[in-house]
Amino acid sequence: MTHLRSLAVVSVLAFAPIADFPTLITTAAYANPTTPEKLWDGFNAPTGIAVHSDGTVYVSNWGDSTVERIAADGTRSAVLRGVPSPAGIAIDAEGTVFVSSYSGDYIVRINPDGSHTRIAENLATPTGIAFSAEGRLLVANRAAGEILSIDPSNGLARVVARSLSLPVGVTEMADGSLVTSQYGGRVTRILPDGSMQELGESFSRPGVGILSDGPDAVFVIDNGAALVRRVSFNGRSEVVVEGFEGSAVALGRATNGDLLVGTWGTGAVYRTPISR
């Protein structure tokens, strides 16, 4: 098992603000902000959502320490139990599911035969996770204020972002930049050269859920306002989904492009199409 606290840092980026990027000054409702449809309830604090290419939906069910699978026909089952505070969830190119344990400080892989293997340990409240184009696992290592990039085959890690404000979500963009949502109030784009662009001025409190939307924008949960925003790199922030019951936390994308949102308080997963 890999003990990340004892690992030497392979690569650390230095950060500098991007002076030439626009500040976030434009805030608006989307052209057609949508009202979500409740698909499923009975969860206990759904925190992460990932969708397999075959349409199977996986939900990290924080309050029950389980990972739930919802088949295309709606059948639900627990594929993993006893995970302390399961948070982020991601599926690799082979269809293998990975989950972060926020309270256990580890990342676990769910193997095709139903067994599970810890691939990295001794993290610092790992929250949102996502795969990079290179197949590395990106981890929002919340308590350490950093983003890690982990080789899922051996658990070796490197720090790719530091000095963040309680990062809870991360996604990679087509240009190789990373965007991270932070519970401390920031949404930050980190370019490959280490420079940063702040995008979160319109947020009440960014949440775990974050997804890319094309090459130059992201969908992000605004946990403090119970809605989903779309933030583009040109400085525009728009409300795209509102009207949730409970506190929006998780964000996933269905195979048809609809957004899936998990809410705390009501223990539900919602679906909403995005109107352009």
Which positions does each model-derived feature cover?
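Short loop/turn segments immediately following the C-termini of beta-strands
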Residues: 62, 102, 142, 182-183, ...
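Bacterial N-terminal signal peptides
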Residues: 8-23
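Short loop/turn segments that connect beta-strands within beta-propeller blades
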Residues: 70-75, 110-115, 150-155, 190-195, ...
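A short beta-strand motif characteristic of beta-propeller blades
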Residues: 35-40, 75-80, 115-120, 156-162, ...
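A short loop-to-beta-strand structural motif that recurs across blades of beta-propeller domains
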Residues: 66-69, 105-109, 146-149, 186-188, ...
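Beta-rich, blade/repeat-based domains predominating
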Residues: 41-54, 82-94, 105-106, 122-136, ...
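Blade/loop signatures of beta-propeller domains
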Residues: 21-34
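Conserved beta-strand element within WD40/beta-propeller blades
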Residues: 59, 99-100, 139-140, 180, ...
